[in-house]
Swiss-Prot record:
Induction: By stress conditions e.g. heat shock. Belongs to the heat shock protein 70 family. It holds the Pfam family HSP70. Residues 569-600 are annotated as: Disordered. This is Chaperone protein DnaK. It comes from Mesomycoplasma hyopneumoniae (strain 7448) (Mycoplasma hyopneumoniae). The gene is dnaK. PANTHER family: HEAT SHOCK PROTEIN 70KDA. Keywords: ATP-binding, Chaperone, Nucleotide-binding, Phosphoprotein, Stress response. It comes from the Bacteria.
């Protein structure tokens, strides 16, 4: 019986790679064309499906050739081809099936399991879509792991004894991620993540395309944008030029028979210098600098604390990228690993760990944004802070806001703002059947659980009745890295204003709760206390109500402190009377009052 092999797959926006563990070492598998990377392109022609290199060649001529489908994963968008609409996961499944097929030929037997990588900022919907794509392709997805984490895993395989902090700079074809990880004793823990979901090597290609269009218009009196085939050829040549300029100072662009001009066929010959290319793409380089700084800040470390800087993605071969990284971090990036293959290698290593082929390696990912629920007054109460290591389960006890409340609504929010309305609403559900009781008495346990694939489950349980409701968060709308970074930035910019709003709401809730409890206590036990003390307490309660109407938070806080002191005296007096009384219920009443005051 053949030993279990779990494929490690980098399902990329531009290219995909598959690797396995062989003799406890990762091996990247070549596709039928002898290449170690496969274009993530699917084409349909005459009811035939074509994947990979052959499909990429049809991008020029076939309108039903589909590229960059990864950008649509987790959305409800579809692509039209072969006289039908395809969901993004269906197209991704065809790429995965192709990788699976040629991997099986190399291995010599069927393979049914895989570890697939995704960008660090893929949300629940995108991760679920990736798992579904694997399922459609006939693969059981054992684990979804973040691409930068996989890269660090590949790099750290032979260095598990040394403690180190690593920054992973991942510039792919369509996405950009920065992660800071800590490696220690075989454990890989993500300290922070940042990035830009709308930045990648394609943007550098597009700058060259724009330059070519302008030059061809000026020198050849021909507009390539007017000819679809000509424009597609420009895009292909732009990618080649970018690659060439990573190794040489000048690259020649040769495009014979690009189109027909006034005087016959147009044969383009142009030269692009690296210095000129770097000047026209300097703004793109700058866009990758801020996420580096943000990732370090989130990890609470300085650049000088980094032991290694890893490069992931073919675009990191550009000298300007490496120079910027070295200048920003004052450290040369490590170029010892193949940036195109390292993510798949890391996925294969994780597969090897799951299959028992590799031991002493533990992978820990994090959640990119804070998760919590909306509580009284519209406050966003966090349960799992951002950058918490996953898998994780956290619980907290909440209660009712009204007397005899038999149902509560659990609103799940994601984000860094202190008010629920300023964050992203992920889902909402009701817990019914709560036993009627005074406000604050029922115990409702809210639990958040994030599994190894980053999928979130939220439950609410009435501790007394045992009634429970659970939802799994599966957003149909994606949250891009750009949106996440914007949310974090907005939280930082509004931190002071949000804190004031939160303080006002919490003070109001605190005051209303205390008034409610004390008025009830005075009604129930007023005969047990001194009339003067009771009169003073009632006067302070009225002053508190007046301040609530005037919305004066600072004065309200001072009055709260005073009334809480009076309430404490009230509780002590009641307790003393209960101790001297022969009636046990009186003692029970005093304890209840004391507990209510402490609760607020």
């Amino acid at each position: 019986m053949a030993k279990e092999i779990i494929l490690g797959i980098d399902l990329g926006t531009t290219n995909s790679v598959v690797a396995i563990i062989e003799n406890q070492k990762p091996v990247v598998l070549e596709n039928p064309n002898g290449k170690r990377t496969t274009p993530s392109v699917v084409a349909f022609k005459n009811n035939e499906e074509i994947v990979g290199d052959a499909a990429k060649r049809q991008l020029e001529t076939n309108p039903e050739a589909i590229a960059s489908i990864k950008r649509l994963m987790g959305t409800d968008k579809t692509v039209r081809a072969n006289e039908r609409d395809y969901k993004p996961e269906e197209i991704s499944a065809k790429i995965l099936a192709y990788l699976k097929e040629y991997a099986e030929k190399k291995i010599g037997h069927k393979v049914t399991k895989a570890v697939i990588t995704v960008p660090a900022y893929f949300d629940n919907a995108q991760r679920e879509a990736t798992k579904n794509a694997g399922k459609i392709a006939g693969l059981q997805v054992e684990r979804i792991i973040n691409e930068p984490t996989a890269a660090a895993l590949a790099f750290g395989l032979d260095k598990t004894e040394k403690e180190m902090k690593v920054l992973v700079y991942d510039l792919g074809g369509g996405t950009f991620d920065v992660s800071v990880l800590e490696l220690s004793g075989g454990t890989f823990e993500v300290l922070s993540t940042s990035g830009d979901n709308h930045l990648g090597g394609d943007d550098w290609d597009n700058e060259i395309v724009n330059w070519l269009v302008k030059k061809i218009k000026e020198e050849y009196d021909f507009d390539p944008k007017s000819d679809k085939m000509a424009l597609t050829r420009l895009k292909e040549e732009a990618e080649k030029t970018k690659i060439n300029l990573s190794n040489q100072s000048v690259s020649t662009v040769s495009l014979p028979f690009l189109g027909m001009g006034k005087n016959g066929p147009i044969n383009v010959e142009l030269e692009l210098k690296r210095s000129e290319f770097e000047k026209m793409t300097a703004h793109l380089i700058d866009r990758t600098r801020k996420p580096i700084v943000d990732a370090l800040k989130q990890a609470k470390i300085e650049a000088s604390d980094l032991d290694e800087v890893l490069l992931v993605g073919g675009s990191t071969r550009m000298p300007a990228v490496q120079s910027m990284i070295e200048h920003t971090l004052n450290k040369k990036p490590n170029r010892s690993i193949n940036p195109d293959e390292v993510v798949a290698i890391g996925a294969a290593i994780q597969g090897g760990v799951l299959a028992g082929e590799i031991s002493d390696v533990l992978l820990l990912d994090v959640t990119p944004l804070t998760l919590g629920i909306e509580t009284l007054g519209g406050i966003a109460t966090p349960l799992i802070p951002r950058n918490t290591t996953i898998p994780v389960t956290k619980s907290q006890i909440f209660s009712t806001a009204e007397d005899n409340q038999t149902e509560v609504t659990i609103s799940v929010v994601q984000g860094e703002r202190q008010l629920a309305a300023d964050n992203k609403m992920l889902g909402r559900f009701n817990l019914s059947g709560i036993e009627a009781a005074p406000r604050g008495l029922p115990q409702i346990e809210v639990s958040f659980s994030i599994d190894v694939n980053g999928i979130t489950t939220v439950s609410a349980k009435d501790k007394k009745t045992g009634k429970e409701q659970t939802i799994t968060i599966k957003n149909t709308s994606t949250l891009s890295e750009e949106e996440i970074n914007k949310m974090i930035q907005e939280a930082e910019e509004n931190r002071e204003a949000d804190a004031l709003k939160k303080d006002k709401i919490e003070t109001t809730v605190r005051a209303e709760g205390l008034i409610n409890q004390l008025e009830k206590s005075i009604t129930d036990q007023g005969e047990k206390i001194d009339p003067k003390q009771k009169e003073l307490l009632e006067k302070q309660i009225q002053e508190l109500k007046d301040l609530l109407k005037e919305e004066k938070t600072d004065e309200l806080k001072l009055k709260l402190d005073q009334i809480e002191a009076a309430a404490q005296s009230f509780a002590q007096a009641t307790a003393q009377q209960a101790n001297t009384s022969e009636s046990d219920p009186k003692a029970d009443d005093s304890n209840t009052i004391d507990a209510e005051i402490k609760q607020d």
